[in-house]
Amino acid sequence: MFKDNPFKEAENYRAVVISYQERRIRKFYKDMRTEIERELKTLDANSDKTDRVYLNQLKFELNNRINQITLQTNDIVRDGVMTTTEMVLQNNKTFLNGIGFYNYNVSPQLVSKMADKVITGKLYDGKWSLSSAIWGAGKRTQFDINKIVSRGILEHKSTYEIAKKLEGYVNPAVRLPVQSGVLGEVDYNAQRLARTMVQHAYQEAFVECTKDNPFVEAYQWITSGMSNVCALCIEREEADEYGLGAGIYPKDALPLDHPNGNCTFDIVTTWDEDSAYSA
């Protein structure tokens, strides 16, 4: 058994990528909120007038901004999937070199082939893709923006009141109350999708590059150890479903982590690490 997880560097890199994605996506929406704040400064907070032309123009501009954010998010997540996959493969190369196998090469074609299983949705055996999911999240946000404006006009709210509600909606630090009829945080769907894609890219690359290694006998499920670990992940770490030990799964039976997951995995092998490096 190896003393240390040979894929620890890739695991740490995955965390860096997820954190970077989170900051970037959140900034997209903060920048949009700043634009609305500028608009609010031009409005009379004491006026009860509802300017439909102004509100429809504001709605149009925000919807265009959401399209831009969608494109940017798609690029960020795609890049995160690719680089995380490559890091796993590089760790595997180091691992194989350490046990005497030097013919393993990490080519751009190999990285793309593995990453595409996640990006195109082949991993999920359904009519799904990263692009369609991100655009779907963007459309839901646009629907919410349109709903805020339409409901405000219907309820005879002032232009300022409606714009203020839009400001609250696009503020990633604010969660609108349930009675508003709109679910927040506004960036939640994009954040959840981004984290899930990188996590699944990490897991898929980990399995693909080790499943045919005869020295790797099984996989071990390891939770993040954080306070918010869900019951399902705790069960996966503690259960001995296959009689191999707690949290240990045959190579063809490692469960795919759930959306927004943060668990990791280790290889199980009887290979003597000390002998390998002293040979």
PLM regions with names:
Residues 1-178, 271-279:
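N-terminal leader/targeting and assembly helices and adjacent pre-domain segments
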Residues 181-279:
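Acidic, glycine-rich two-metal-ion catalytic cores of nucleic acid-processing enzymes
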